[in-house]
From Swiss-Prot:
Gene3D superfamilies in the cross-refs: Dihydrodipicolinate Reductase, domain 2 (3.30.360.10), NAD(P)-binding Rossmann-like Domain (3.40.50.720)
Source organism: Bifidobacterium longum (strain NCC 2705)
Entry GO terms, CC: cytoplasm
Keywords: Amino-acid biosynthesis, Arginine biosynthesis, Cytoplasm, NADP, Oxidoreductase
Lineage: Bacteria, Bacillati, Actinomycetota, Actinomycetes, Bifidobacteriales
Entry keyword annotation includes Cell membrane: no
Protein name: N-acetyl-gamma-glutamyl-phosphate reductase
Recorded GO MF terms: N-acetyl-gamma-glutamyl-phosphate reductase activity; NAD binding; NADP+ binding
Active site per the UniProt annotation: C157
Catalyzed reactions per annotation: N-acetyl-L-glutamate 5-semialdehyde + phosphate + NADP(+) = N-acetyl-L-glutamyl 5-phosphate + NADPH + H(+)
Pathway(s) it belongs to: Amino-acid biosynthesis; L-arginine biosynthesis; N(2)-acetyl-L-ornithine from L-glutamate: step 3/4
Amino acid sequence: MAKYTVAVAGATGYAGGEALRILAAHPDFDITCVAGHSSVGESMAKHMPHIPQLANLVVEDTAPEVLNGHDVIILALPHGASGKLASQLDPNAVVVDLGADHRLEEQAAWDEFYGGDFYEHWTYGMPELITGKAADGSYTRQRAALPGTKRIAGPGCNVTATTLALQPGIAEGLVESQDIVADLVVGYSGAGKNLKRTNLLAAEALQSALPYSVGGKHRHIPEILQNFAHAAGKSAAEASEFTLGFTPILAPMSRGILATVSARMTDKAKTLSDEEIRAVWSKAYEGQDFMVLLPEGTLPATGNIIGSNAAHLQVVTDRKAGRIYAFAAIDNLNRGTAGQAVQSLNIALGLPEDAGLTKIGVAP
């Protein structure tokens, strides 16, 4: 069988570069086009020396006529750019947007947090997302929507960690929808590759941690609430039933997200033992190969998931505070962005879901 040809726009950025790294080793894809903006005409040997297979490729302009003609098109572009370009792309190609333009279902949420043109919602690329329950009580998941789709919206990295941490408790009614709190320690690659005082100057970043987009302003908040609503078996229009205090904190590491998500226990949760609550998380992720519920007493650490598409998870209870604490550690560029996108792409094309991916991290 011939390999699928792939074009990647935004190829010299962090997200695009991680997509290239994964796809270059994938048995079913052939990277035949890399596109950019300020780097047009430059060799990939300059920008991605860690991917020698791409050394002979030259960055082309990010234009429909360049991207069309490929089986798969990956868009790793700033929000607003993908939406404008997408309508000009081949409807028969599978297009994956790693940006925000096609994630949100409700225009009101987009207008509040992003502004500008609102674009059509695409098939959401988080296979493990719980979307409700079937008649037999088993979970329905977003995975079922992916086979055959031609348009995939890649989730946000902070969204991924927060959702995977808490969704079992939401789906089983163990946590209250109000007063959910998420504190995330985030690696600097999550802030993008543009040179900023707080993100790429070593003298500003080393030995320092910095909160950002605080006070309910972070653009990932509406997407998280949308996912919480779906996990509860509700529509995106009902996401306002949930409230979230969300604080991301940049930490001096290149990759990784450690999410600590807490919520008030419901009366149902208070009747359960700690072992029974843990069993809910175990059941929710049974058969989900990239989801790793760590042994009791072992907490997730970002150092264990670097380079992998896995999420390391844990759940504990604080009976005195009346709260459940759920933890998730992911690689923001892999599981949080490109790895999850390739996983969804595999499903869309009928390939093995884990093709080209690993849940083995690099440690130390």
